[in-house]
Amino acid sequence: MSEAIAKLLSPRSVAVIGASADPGKTSGRPVAYLRKHGYAGRILPVNPKVDRIGDLPCYPDVASLPEVPDVAVVLLGAERAHQAVKELAGRGCAAAIVLASGYTETGEEGARRQQQLVEAAGSMRILGPNTIGLVNLTDGIVLSPSGALEMDEFPVGGIGVVSQSGGILGSLLSRAAARGIGLSKLIATSNEVDLELADFIDHLADDPATQVIALYIETVRHPARFRAACLKAARAGKPVVAFKIGRSEAGAQAAVSHTGAMAGADRMYDALFRQVGVIRAKSFSDLLDIPAALATGRRLHGRRVAILTSTGGAGTLVSDDLGVAGFETPAPDAATAQALRDLQTGSEAVLDRNPIDVTLAGLRPDLLRGAIRALLASPTYDALVIIVGSSSLAMPELLAGAIQDCLPDSGKPVLAYVSPHAPEIGALLMRRGVPAFAAAESCTAALAGMLQVAAFEEPAQAAVAPASTGMAGMDHLSAGALDEAEAKAVFSRFGVPCASERVVRTAAEAEAAARELGGRVVLKILSSHITHKSDVGGVAVGLAPEAIGERLGRMADEVEARAGERPQRFLVQQMVAGGTELILGLHRDALGTAVLLGMGGVTAELFQDTALRLLPEQDGRLCPLAPGDALDMARSLKTWPLLDGFRGRPRADVPALVDAIVAFSAMAAALGARVAEAEINPVFVLPEGQGVCAADGVLVLG
């Protein structure tokens, strides 16, 4: 745990640079809020034009402060903030919070000012700039002018929030308070000139007051640090939930302009989150809903959900949404159904189906307790959703108390769906330890997040490939696109099996090669300039040896007519019979280097059924994917059933596919930045025990 970050979040003394005596001004709020919310440390306002703020003496400058503050809140504009930062650093202050905007997010001049700020800080840590600050609810410390702090009190709980947007931090704080959701720490990192997401994820992973970490992300500036921090949180048993904006082109552009940073492709973020166990919130409301469920500490170990209701329509709504998401809502087993009947719920109750509808009898606290206990004790169910209907509005305390009384009986998740518009009941349930939601979809999202946490296993780290692995014989390859034969020779060196083939120049050589390979063959042009050979007539399949010579001549003429280049070299390749065609490729952007796997062949771009996994890093060097990650890629494809024996098809050689993915990733790791582009399409995955075979390939070296 960083000492500077510990002081930033729990300072014994706070200097407020540019403080105003008017609490109605932004510059007056930090001092006012510190006092309003009971900060027990020393407050040191600095303003040469003000003598006192309330009963606090105000100092003319940083040099006049009677002590070195742990933290300073800098309220000056961008033109003057760096000078205050320099003076604070000179005094030995641990960290400064710089609120001013007008830095990298505004363009070149702002970037210059941001660099000036970095130089002024030296070794002092900086939160911001362009930040709204932070709030430590655990210890009652508010270092922010956010208007959300006008509220008198906030529920304190186990959810830590890190946001790259100051406005969103205030929104989450006020929304959580209104719903009775307890938070521990909230930090707005914003421009991240120094301290960033990863620093606070790492810190919160060690924070005993935080059980769940919620992130609002615009961009990840240092993927390796982010990955390490998230894995640390996972090892500590602290789930991380992230809402990442930039899913659309417009959103991505807005995110970049807001933070002044490069953004990776959205699907790359999906891959990164999946690999480090981060739950991706699909909506902004999920960013509170999912952590609220996880903060209970209850764990979900299956997909079978009991729905207890007193209103049929709302129960059906929840059941339908759960079913769409892949959850099961089985009927009660015989013993559970009998236990429910023994409660004497009345003749109108529906106890042998799910949702279990106890009708208005469910308003009796004793009956409700009995039904909840019976369902939680049932081996048929992994979780329970309780529907709070309109009839409960008259007795919310009795209802909440009855549910709360049953929580110690089981560690299974218990959620509530509040069907009417009754936010006060939802907040009451939240305060009693029952995650309560105003939408059926929120119940589903919360359970899906809990299931993802239970299923995550950190993949084994593959060893760093030696720089020389597979490099023998590559010195002669110059920068630029290789032809197919050269590309596949490189793939083969790294352990990717390739189809048997011969390079030829003449019809006679082609016929001899075809006879040597045996059976029917494929004829292709060899060119480093023409990537999509079939588009210009440069591929012919199923050729017999006696026909290949004549076909070579016609192919040369056709390619010359279409591409303006007469091919001089050709490839005669063994036909690959059977198997499933996949594509294996390399993708690189601001987040890092990733391997892509998907449905291959000529339909690859049409179906867009792909999986991405980022290569891990160790000591600054890329590593191959671990076999577990490679297998997870294959299983995540929509077309996975085709590999797994769908409708009587022979099972594919998945272990050989996993080996090929790992080998391809080892090539990407070993060659590093020298690989500009790499793709095998198709790679044939043959029936079980027969291996895989790369039938075409592209490799561009930088």
Label every model-predicted segment.
Residues 1-702:
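Catalytic-core regions of core metabolic enzymes
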